[in-house]
């Protein structure tokens, strides 16, 4: 059982957005790998999250939906306003 481990060699990971390079030992065949987002430019790691990227739990989402449903139930439905009279319907013989 000799020589069963893969050969590891240095591989360069290039971030496409911020142009930063990481050199990591890897068993990959390529010597260069392009990645889209790294720890230098991802919003989670740099602390610039907005409301859409903030992580929320399932229970909080369920509570928000439940409260929205209760608010809709408690509202009285608005009456539709009639905007003038429309023409009476014609029968097939009249057309």
From Swiss-Prot:
Which InterPro entries does its entry note?
Ribosomal_bL28/bL31-like_sf, Ribosomal_bL31, Ribosomal_bL31_A, Ribosomal_bL31_sf
In the record, biological process GO terms are: translation
**Keyword vocabulary terms for this entry:** Ribonucleoprotein, Ribosomal protein, RNA-binding, rRNA-binding
| Extent of Basic and acidic residues compositional bias | 80-95
Q: Which Gene3D superfamilies match?
A: Ribosomal protein L31
Report one GO cellular component: ribosome
Named from the GO MF annotations, one term is: structural constituent of ribosome
Q: Which region ranges are annotated with the description Disordered? A: 68-95
A Pfam family of this chain? Ribosomal_L31
Q: Extract the HAMAP family matched here.
A: Ribosomal_bL31_1 (MF_00501)
Q: Which family does it belong to?
A: Belongs to the bacterial ribosomal protein bL31 family. Type A subfamily.
Biological function: Binds the 23S rRNA.
The record's section on PANTHER family has: 50S RIBOSOMAL PROTEIN L31, CHLOROPLASTIC, LARGE RIBOSOMAL SUBUNIT PROTEIN BL31C
- Quote the subunit structure annotation: Part of the 50S ribosomal subunit.
Protein name stated in the entry: Large ribosomal subunit protein bL31
Organism taxonomic ancestry: Bacteria, Bacillati, Mycoplasmatota, Mycoplasmoidales, Mycoplasmoidaceae
**What is the gene name?**
rpmE
């Amino acid at each position: 059982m000799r020589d069963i481990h893969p050969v590891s060699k240095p591989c360069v990971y290039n971030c496409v957005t911020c142009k930063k390079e990481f050199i990591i030992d890897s068993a990959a065949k390529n010597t260069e790998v392009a990645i889209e987002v790294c720890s230098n430019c991802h919003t989670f790691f740099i602390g610039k999250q907005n409301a859409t990227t903030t992580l929320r739990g399932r229970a909080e989402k369920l509570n928000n939906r439940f409260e929205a449903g209760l608010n809709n139930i408690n509202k009285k439905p608005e009456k539709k306003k009639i905007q003038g009279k429309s023409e009476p319907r014609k029968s097939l013989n009249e057309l």
